Amino acid sequence: YEIRLSLVGSEMCIRDSVHPVTGEVFSVAHGNAMIYKYDPEQNTMVATGVQLPDAAGKNASKVKIRCILFDKAGTTVYMSSQNKHVIYKGDYDMSKGEFSNLHIWVGQYDTKGFTEGQGNEAKLEEPCQMDLDEEGNIYVAVRKKHRIAKITPDGMLTNYTGTGLSGTTDGTLDKAQFNHPEGLQFGPDGALYISDYWNHKIRKIEKD
């Protein structure tokens, strides 16, 4: 590339996301947990004024967002924080271009572990990339626990596959093992593809 764009200047930005309907580009700065939006007229990312909350509902900081995921309608947004061990959820108004109701949806802020459960009763350690299936369930790579978790639309987290121990075993969902999975995405064939980081492999889970 001859021209490169610095998305958020001195604030470290790890992931961005393109809105599925409007084509808008968003990112979250690590330093102040602020959501940024690309302004084509200024050719730069500008702050929206919306910051992610911490456990007390105050403005968070040093939140390492690994995935920004919109639903197909573009009205709901999910964000995974690797270092705070939570999944955020919020609303997006396309007509106004505004986020609202951003809250910690699943997991416990700054608390490590892996516990199946509803919403903030659940625990997950280092959630990374996420994707949605046709029924609205979210699948998330839980890096530190070597698991792929499933979250239902009402916020129930369960283990989808992975034993919790690092390994490279193929097999059924209850026996397969991973080693720090970070990325995942559904392919056009309906299969779930997983970037298994320390195994240096792309794994595939066939569609049922």
Model features per residue range: what roles?
Residues 24-27, 76-79, 137-140, 191-193:
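Conserved beta-propeller blade signature
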Residues 4-6, 10-11, 15, 42-66, ...:
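Gly/Pro-rich loop segments of beta-rich domains
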Residues 30-31, 82-83, 92, 143, ...:
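Short loop/turn segments immediately following the C-termini of beta-strands
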Residues 38-45, 89-98, 206-208:
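Short loop/turn segments immediately following beta-strands, especially the blade-tip
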Residues 18-22, 70-74, 132-135, 186-189:
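Residue-level detector of Asp-centered blade-edge/turn motifs that repeat once per structural unit
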Residues 33-37, 85-89, 146-150, 156, ...:
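A short loop-to-beta-strand structural motif that recurs across blades of beta-propeller domains
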Residues 180-208:
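Blade-level signature of beta-propeller repeat domains, shared across WD40, Kelch, NHL, RCC1
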